[in-house]
């Protein structure tokens, strides 16, 4: 399996809306020539991810094909995205629903620390969690 960064047009229309500008970066995991998972890094302005959220690089949207789950693909995608983001910045953020235990656990394993919680209509729990990872913590 390979994890690689893709650009607009690399995957046709399937992901065109996810990589519309220089602030959205798509990474895919391919097996047997087929995309089996993807994740993004999005550069956001202050408050764009939620009230009181900082500007910066945010990990976003890991999705793994159900037939390919439980193979550490989300972990591999996260490693590659972090390496890419830390080549550009000292801190990486992510926001997820407070009820998204799989995402919270995945990111905690990399050392992400919760910064704050805030009300959100995007999450079924009605609450999102903002977490941060500093470059030094990622390398330990």
Where do the protein language model's features map onto the residues?
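Short amphipathic alpha-helix that is part of the acyltransferase structural core
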Residues: 1-30
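A short, internal acetyl-CoA/4′-phosphopantetheine-binding micro-motif in the GNAT/acyltransferase core
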Residues: 59-69, 96-97
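Conserved beta-strand in the GNAT
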Residues: 28, 34-45, 58-63
């Amino acid at each position: 399996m390979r994890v690689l960064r893709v650009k607009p047009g690399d995957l046709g229309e399937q992901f065109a809306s996810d990589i519309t500008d220089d602030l959205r970066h798509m990474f895919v995991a391919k097996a047997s020539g087929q995309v089996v998972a993807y994740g993004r890094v999005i550069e956001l302005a202050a408050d764009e991810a939620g009230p009181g959220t900082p500007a910066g690089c945010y990990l976003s949207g890991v999705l793994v094909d159900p037939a390919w789950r439980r193979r550490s693909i989300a972990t591999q995608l996260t490693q590659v995205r972090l390496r890419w983001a830390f080549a550009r910045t000292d801190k990486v953020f992510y926001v997820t629903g407070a009820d998204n235990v799989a995402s919270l656990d995945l990111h905690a394993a990399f050392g992400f620390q919760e910064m704050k919680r805030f009300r959100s209509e995007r999450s079924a729990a009605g609450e999102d969690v903002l977490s941060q990872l500093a470059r030094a913590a990622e390398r330990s």
